[in-house]
């Protein structure tokens, strides 16, 4: 449950005097019995948002007397698809997903309000910051373009996971030298979900 307990625990001193923390994440897509690792950024951070688009309702036969929130909201969803493809470097990892678009009403009634919810993932804090900036810019532009009122709630709740490179290599080397039954492999960053990751035997 966002924002999780780690931040509060750290602020209360749970890591005082601690040099390193080792964490384990179980993934069903990985080969059973193996240990996978990666120095640096390895798992994406997350944010989520809710956007309320307030227009003016009306009858379907008289669109000129209304301000269609569904049209404005649909434009936002479409424009959002360009954030990753046109605002991020090809070498950055980011994704924006719209998981909910609530505009249910009657077939002959122009909807006065829609609510949109989305999920944001970024492999670095800088990537997440760029996506957040663009979402806020688009919501503001929506007001200017369609004359609607937008209320945006943006929650940046989980940072990206960063493994200290030197310590990570030390742990991997130690496991390899222990000659245990399981393999030790380096993996690609986990971007947004549990994907089958390409791996390289070391």
Predicted features along the sequence, with ranges:
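Metal-dependent amide/peptide-bond hydrolase catalytic core
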Residues: 71-195
């Amino acid at each position: 449950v966002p924002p999780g307990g780690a931040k509060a625990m750290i602020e209360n001193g749970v890591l005082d005097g601690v040099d390193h923390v080792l964490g384990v994440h179980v993934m069903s897509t990985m080969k059973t019995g193996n240990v996978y690792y990666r120095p640096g950024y390895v798992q994406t951070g997350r944010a989520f948002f809710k956007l309320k688009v307030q227009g003016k309702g009306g009858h379907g036969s008289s669109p000129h007397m209304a301000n269609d929130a569904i049209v404005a909201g649909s434009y936002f969803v479409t424009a959002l698809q360009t954030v990753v493809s046109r605002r991020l470097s090809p070498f950055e990892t980011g994704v924006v997903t719209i998981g909910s678009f609530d505009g249910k009403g009657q077939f002959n009634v122009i909807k006065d309000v829609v609510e949109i919810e989305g999920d944001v993932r970024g492999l670095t804090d800088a990537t997440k910051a760029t996506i957040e900036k663009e979402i806020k810019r688009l919501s503001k532009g929506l007001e200017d373009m369609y004359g609607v009122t937008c209320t945006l709630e943006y929650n940046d709740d989980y940072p990206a996971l960063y493994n200290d490179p030197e310590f990570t290599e030390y742990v991997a080397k130690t496991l390899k030298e222990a000659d245990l039954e399981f393999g030790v492999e380096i993996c690609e960053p986990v971007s947004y979900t549990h994907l089958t990751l390409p791996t390289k035997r070391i």
